[in-house]
Regions:
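P-loop NTP-binding core
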Residues: 1-264
């Protein structure tokens, strides 16, 4: 079982879209998946067809504030092999509420470790959807994860933001999670008609080499529509370009397995 965070400090890069479609793609290949929505916006929650306005105690917030155990708040989605721990806006208050706890960066890791040790959980992957910023919740995810998937928007300034993220990851490795590694970088919102997308791709591949997935995720209307219907695009419209790309990405992700221990 692996814990993988999908992360980028910049918003609007396809992070949540990648979480829910990777989760759906893996579940279609008979992998058992738990998604943890660690973003107070709750977009992964609604994108998988659940409500993000329920009682906060029944969300990841209830676990992190000590009210609930993970086993008590896992919810079934409408999709086979795919469960979720939901989120809502109350999660945004956690940083202030835990200000006096010197070990707060480890809260999620401690809760996950207890759950995995004490339960019969048989998930193949736990996927964490991180907030689009570097805050306590993001640090909790980085501390808890085995590896990271980084969506990279194929647009101007994207690589600059990625460089900042790499520095953050290195700091976390030095002080909090030395085993953390980058599983891969996924180019998103790619427009093959646009020279800029091709330029960003070339620069990313030149700099990060085989850390960049072969698959690229295109700009696609159906990909944008699917979350409003509470389902991954792989189910909403499995024949659209966005779906085909995420199916390909899922295959590439699974085929990485023998190489997982490589350093970031």
């Amino acid at each position: 079982m692996q814990i993988i965070s999908v992360i980028n400090q910049k918003g609007g890069v396809g992070k949540t879209t990648t979480v829910i479609n990777l989760a759906a793609g893996l579940s279609k290949q008979k992998k058992k998946i738990l998604v943890i929505d660690l973003d107070p916006q709750g977009n992964a929650t609604t994108g998988l067809g659940l409500s993000n306005i329920e009682n906060s105690v029944e969300t990841i917030y209830g676990v992190l504030n000590g009210t609930k155990k993970i086993s008590e708040i896992i919810k079934k989605t409408g999709f086979e092999n795919l469960d979720i721990i939901t989120s809502n806006v109350d999660l945004s208050g956690l940083e202030v509420e835990t200000a006096g706890d010197s070990n707060r960066a480890f809260i999620l890791k401690i809760k996950l470790t207890a759950y995995l040790n004490d339960s019969r959980a048989d998930y193949d992957y736990i996927l964490i959807d991180c907030p689009p910023s570097l805050n306590l919740l993001t640090v909790m995810a980085l501390v808890s994860s085995d590896s990271l998937v980084v969506p990279l928007q194929a647009e101007f300034f994207a690589l600059e933001g990625l460089t900042q993220l790499m520095k953050t990851i290195e700091r976390i490795k030095v002080s909090l999670n030395p085993e953390l590694n980058i599983r891969g970088i996924l180019l998103t919102m790619y427009d093959k008609r646009n020279k800029l997308s091709a330029q960003v791709e070339k620069e990313a591949r030149d700099y990060f080499s085989d850390k960049v997935y072969t698959t690229v995720i295109p700009r696609n209307v159906r990909l944008s529509e699917a979350p409003s219907h509470g389902m991954p695009v792989l189910i909403y419209d499995k024949s659209c370009p966005g779906s085909k790309s995420y199916f390909n990405f899922t295959d590439e992700f699974i085929n990485q397995e023998p190489q997982i221990g490589s350093a970031a």
